[in-house]
């Protein structure tokens, strides 16, 4: 432990002297109040400290004490359904302890409840050889999540004691005799430094799709379990709603939601909505699988920088248990702004638009911790982390540094479009500018699993939308009637895809989530109409007659999004109805 004293204070940056025994990334207690800070730069005996709490009232001469430990998180039972701030302080227990609606400075509360007892069930017995990553036993943390207690990293040997029963997170539950003869006494909890990624046995190629229930994403721009996606868009385009929808309905085991520098009422929406929503995969409340990290815009700026790392470290912990995890960061732009502020106060050489020159590497460090892995341990298991980051470029300008550095790393780009949002088309993901580099892998995976021609249908639907975009300029100049019959059909079918398929109501209990079988049935109906109508045109029918003759079935196709999943056969039955009505138009002569 090293004690120095403050010489300057500049917002969240404090410089202290007499710190020659300290190290970069050490956690410090700053001032008489004992504020939490982290050393981010060392020059001789002077340490530059990033303080994670409000520094007003702190002055030169006050003491700074190092702990000798890096910024770490506590990992164990009690994480699920909990809400933490950026440095893993539990907000509900913080409020009870301080009797304040705001964060009181200098208050230290353990991240995991030291009084709560958890029922531990051993899975291994005394005398067995264990290595890092082996599952020693389980705790049923919620109705959905079985918390698997693992042997910590760099610990291996012979299990000499393991106890069943109810324990707090600090009680000794097992003992391991290591190769050097020492006895390691382990509890239900372990700690891990947030800036260091947790080790894995092997990184694997992600192939299984993350089903979000959002048709535009799952059909055209899918992301895999273990993939990375970015959601850039201007103010009001729907970034947060897209993130909330994925957090609610994605087919993952655990969701980590990081509210980083965004409005507090968005986290309030999460707290109000999530407990009432039922996960379609488990039938339980969505909060039973969710960890919330709230670092809203009125909280200290420096803690935003830590909140992203706190979230991804908790995600890695659950991944190591063999779970699939999704982490939502809303928004990485606010995190980058925190980096820019600290860089400016350190008087570092600025890069593009004042951001630090190392912005790209910091963003890469975060996203590369996502992925599909084979975990440590003698038991064979896989885990995944899917990272989805919202980006808030000023004025929707995606040429700014945060968006550009993000797009260099992620493989999925869901570009939110202000004109679409203004037309009340939600999700406002622009199908012409967005892309997914996982499309081929996901398409072939679904074709194998469902024995269908899904990837071909997706290609045909996208070709129709692209053809519509090329015809739009002609239509604006000379009108729709100047187009050929075939092109008029293309415009009509593209409108069906846009309005009846891609547009989705997040506030409708049925339309808010669509399974893959329902998506395929809906898309098949629209493509069947296009195919049969195109044949009818080539046989001499008129476009107007086809549209009038199929008005009823097209209306039923439009309303099929509101048909519940259990009535899927009703949607599939429309395919034959489409063919029958177009044949009926032809039978009447088509003219």
Swiss-Prot record:
Residues annotated for ATP binding in this entry: 233-240
GO molecular function, one term: ATP binding
UniProt EC number: 7.1.2.2
Gene name, Swiss-Prot/TrEMBL: atpA
Gene3D superfamilies for this protein: 2.40.30.20, 2.40.50.100, Bovine Mitochondrial F1-atpase, Atp Synthase Beta Chain, Chain D, domain 3, P-loop containing nucleotide triphosphate hydrolases
Keywords: ATP synthesis, ATP-binding, Hydrogen ion transport, Ion transport, Nucleotide-binding, Translocase, Transport
Family according to the record: Belongs to the ATPase alpha/beta chains family.
GO terms under cellular component: proton-transporting ATP synthase complex
Pfam family, one: ATP-synt_ab_Xtn
Sequence intervals crossing the membrane: none
Top-level EC class: translocase
An annotated GO BP: proton motive force-driven plasma membrane ATP synthesis
Catalytic activity: ATP + H2O + 4 H(+)(in) = ADP + phosphate + 5 H(+)(out)
Protein name as it appears in the record: V-type ATP synthase alpha chain
Its job: Produces ATP from ADP in the presence of a proton gradient across the membrane. The V-type alpha chain is a catalytic subunit.
Cross-referenced PROSITE patterns: ATPASE_ALPHA_BETA
HAMAP family recorded: ATP_synth_A_arch (MF_00309)
